[in-house]
Every structure is written in structure tokens, then in C-alpha cells.
């Protein structure tokens, strides 16, 4: 009996060592389509992690909303069933709206450099602290994305052309309010549902960066890319704190450093792809149509007044002046 107890004890001691040898699977979800800049960079992340962890960590990527829209994925990352989320606008606009809605205000952000100055600097720290406290989502990095453009089946030059047009926008208050004030009939909808809605005529148009217009094949259902360039933003990478806190220190370092590298690679791919995407969309039958930007900017000039009571005091002005 004594020998049996000793064997059992030895087995119990060996168990953690055996468990440690099993590769940890990391699931990363995102709505950006397969083959785009974000997806290519996610593939690099998987390779970097496998190499640096010597196979102890493996990454499975789920592009194109395979794990649901961004609303669903926020919950999954919070619970730890998805370990890493690679998000567009939904996350900060809904979870930390006091800051996120400001960044989603049309024509507030002047350029990609302006955006990065805000989100990579001290102004954004309270936003990331709130993200962690409210939902257990740890901010890691931002990757670039192209400007958002409106796609439709008839050319749009000024807001007057939008009257009565049914537009899909993300599930974000500032987006909904902006397009309503421009005269459109707004339908918030998760991205994976948009292609079918366009094909069936449930909606007349949508707005997204060129990458998502291409990878979601919207050129099969839309004729015009109207060059509104109304939002300049990025993709945010967050990890589940519930999962991350349980990683050994060396694996935490590998994951964090590889995610930052992933975003720098994505920035490069995105810059390279932007002009290529324009050519591909034109080849797919789309016309790139200039708009009268000043008519959109002036029509939306009062939008911040609708929301400023909800926003973090002084944040809008600080972004404007940065």
C-alpha cells in the first residue's frame, strides 16, 4: 500500500510537467476577411509565436467573422473562450464610449498619423484602463486601417443624394447619428450579414475601408465607392485578461511582443495594399467617385453637440488640438 501511495504521489508531481508539454492553443478572432492585410499579419503572428515558444503555443486564426460579429466576440474574449480579439470600431465605441465615440466622430481625425498620436499616447491611457476594468480586456496595440468610404449603387456627391437611402452602419451611436443627420435611413448590422443584405436589396449601401469592401466582395453588389473618407481609425488588438493572467511570464512576453510586431507588419501590408485594392475594385466593376467633402463636413459640424455630455471631459478638444 505504501508503494501505491508513493507511485500516486510521484504521478501527481509529474502531472504538471506533462500538462506543460501540451501546446497551448490560442484562438484569435476578427471580422476582417481572409487574404487582407489584417489576416496576413495574423498569419505572421501565428508563425512568430510558434517559433519563439518552440511549439509550446499554437495560434488558430478565425477571419471573416467565423466566430461571430464584433459584439459576440467581445463577450467571447471577456470569457476567455477567444483569447485574442482583433477589433474594428465596435469595441471602444460601445465598451468605453466616453472616449471611443469621440474617435469615431466623422472628420475629427485628420490623418492616420493624427490617429496614432492619440491612441499611442497618454491621452488614451484612461480608455485602456476602463477597458480592462469593465470587461477584462487588456489593450495591446493598434494596427492601421484605410479611411472609410461609402459604397452605393448610385453616385453620391453631396448629402442631398443620400435622402431616403438605406445604409448599413456599425452598431455605434455616433455612426447612426451621423448618417441619419445626412438624410439616410440607417440600419445597424453586424458585418457578416452585410453582403446578403446588399444582394437582396434590404440595404442600398454601406461604408468601410477598401480592404473590407474587397475581402467581403461588396463589389459584386455595389457600383460606386464614394470618396467620403469620413473616418480614419485602426484595428485594436486586445487579449482576455482571464486567460492572459494565467500564462507563465515568458509566454506573456512572447505573446505581447509578437502582437506588437503583428501590427507593425499589418501597417506595412495596409499601406502597400491600398492602391492595389483600388485597382482590384475597379477591375471588379466599381467606379471611384469624388464627393464634395465640404458639404459633408459642414452637415456634420454640430454632431459633437449631441454627444459631448456623454464624453470624457476635455477629450474631444484635446483630440482636436493634438
Residue ranges and their predicted role:
Residues 2-5:
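Low-complexity basic/metal-binding stretches
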Residues 117:
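Short beta-strand-centered segments that line the small-molecule binding cleft or hinge
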Amino acid at each position: 500500500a505504501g508503494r501505491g501511495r508513493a507511485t500516486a504521489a510521484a504521478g501527481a508531481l509529474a502531472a504538471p510537467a506533462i500538462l506543460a508539454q501540451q501546446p497551448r492553443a490560442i484562438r484569435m478572432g476578427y471580422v476582417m476577411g481572409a487574404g487582407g492585410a489584417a489576416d496576413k499579419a495574423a498569419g505572421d503572428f501565428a508563425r512568430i509565436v510558434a517559433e519563439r515558444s518552440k511549439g509550446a503555443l499554437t495560434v488558430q486564426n478565425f477571419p471573416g467573422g467565423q466566430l461571430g460579429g464584433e459584439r459576440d466576440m467581445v463577450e467571447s474574449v471577456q470569457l476567455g473562450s477567444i483569447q485574442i480579439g482583433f477589433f474594428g470600431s465596435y469595441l471602444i465605441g460601445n465598451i468605453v464610449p466616453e472616449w471611443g465615440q469621440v474617435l469615431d466622430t466623422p472628420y475629427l481625425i485628420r490623418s492616420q498619423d493624427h490617429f496614432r498620436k492619440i491612441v499611442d499616447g497618454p491621452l488614451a491611457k484612461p480608455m485602456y484602463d476602463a477597458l480592462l476594468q469593465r470587461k477584462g480586456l487588456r489593450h495591446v496595440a493598434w494596427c492601421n486601417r484605410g479611411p472609410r468610404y461609402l459604397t452605393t449603387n448610385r453616385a453620391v456627391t453631396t448629402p442631398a443624394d443620400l435622402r431616403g437611402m438605406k445604409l448599413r452602419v456599425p452598431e455605434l451611436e455616433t455612426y447612426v447619428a451621423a448618417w441619419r443627420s445626412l438624410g439616410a435611413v440607417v440600419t445597424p448590422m453586424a458585418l457578416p450579414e452585410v453582403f446578403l443584405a446588399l444582394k437582396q436589396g434590404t440595404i442600398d449601401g454601406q461604408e468601410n475601408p477598401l480592404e473590407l469592401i474587397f475581402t467581403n466582395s461588396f463589389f459584386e453588389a455595389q457600383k460606386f465607392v464614394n470618396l467620403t473618407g469620413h473616418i480614419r481609425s485602426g484595428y485594436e488588438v486586445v487579449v482576455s485578461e482571464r486567460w492572459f493572467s494565467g500564462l507563465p511570464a515568458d509566454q506573456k512576453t512572447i505573446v505581447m511582443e509578437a502582437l506588437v510586431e503583428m501590427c507593425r507588419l499589418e501597417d506595412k501590408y495596409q499601406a502597400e495594399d491600398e492602391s492595389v485594392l483600388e485597382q482590384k475594385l475597379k477591375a471588379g466593376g466599381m467606379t471611384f467617385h469624388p464627393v464634395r467633402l465640404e458639404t459633408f463636413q459642414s452637415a456634420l459640424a454640430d454632431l459633437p453637440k449631441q454627444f459631448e455630455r456623454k464624453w470624457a471631459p476635455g477629450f474631444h478638444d484635446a483630440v482636436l488640438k493634438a
